[in-house]
Amino acid sequence: MAVLAPLIALVYSVPRLSRWLARPYYFLSALLSAAFLLVRKLPPVCESLPTQREDGNPCDFDWREVEILMFLSAIVMMKNRRSITVEQHVGNIFMFSKVANAILFFRLDIRMGLLYITLCIVFLMTCKPPLYMGPEYIKYFSDKTIDEELERDKRVTWIVEFFANWSSDCQSFAPIYADLSLKYNCTGLNFGKVDVGRYTDVSTRYKVSTSPLTKQLPTLILFQGGKEVMRRPQIDKKGRAVSWTFSEENVIREFNLNELYQRAKKLSKAGDKIPEEQPVAAVPAAVPDEESKKDK
């Protein structure tokens, strides 16, 4: 199953992959990932390469290169078991393929290895992964508007994502969060986002660390009555995020989105008859110690 699941997901997403390859970032990344395969297999380039094969064929893999490629396949399958979206699957394949390519090129010729590393550095500096541009019902906050919007109508429940464009986890979660906003956004339940990579004072104010070591990005916070009710991922005593998978099912379950949505619809139907002090959702204001220990 560990092998079949990624293959089925890959085949199912062939149309989307074809659109990706039309973009410079994915096309160049795929080209770099397959660089050693192309150099080793395509004549006349491969004919001048050194080889350790007994038959002396320079256009075929030797046993050590096969071992490295098999090890790469095992690592990719292990990493993809925790991947949720196709973007995460493809990202893992690209990343570990480039590492394997660098090892193979350095083993072949140190000059080719240095050239490949240089190309990868230039690629990272000049090409950025495309941001999600699909449909969504999400309001984007700045450092000046987030507090004002949360306090404007305390009957409205807000789910706010704290993200940074450089974070691959945030990029992978973007289509999931957008899909949730399309399904659950209504008058009494709104979705928002704030770029803490750009507005650093917001990250300090809401205690969301932007350091890659803490793994706190993305962070989802539920606000009711203008105050924080819960957040995912939770933070341990060392300031590191407790491991939590940002899947659509987990967000719906942990944040009680179905219940929040039903209560928000009742709020929109009742209008001004409902006083502001009435709670919008029955989500506990604090996470019990037992749950925190269980999550950890």
From Swiss-Prot:
Gene3D superfamilies: Glutaredoxin
One GO-annotated biological process of the protein: brain development
Subunit structure: Monomer. Homodimer; disulfide-linked. Occurs in both reduced and oxidized monomeric form. Oxidative conditions increase homodimerization. Interacts with CANX. Interacts with ATP2A2.
Entries under PANTHER family matching the protein: THIOREDOXIN-RELATED (PTHR15853), THIOREDOXIN-RELATED TRANSMEMBRANE PROTEIN 2 (PTHR15853:SF0)
Domain of life: Eukaryota
Gene: TMX2
Entry protein name: Thioredoxin-related transmembrane protein 2
Domain Thioredoxin: 132-269
Organism, scientific name: Bos taurus
Presence of keyword Cytoplasm: no
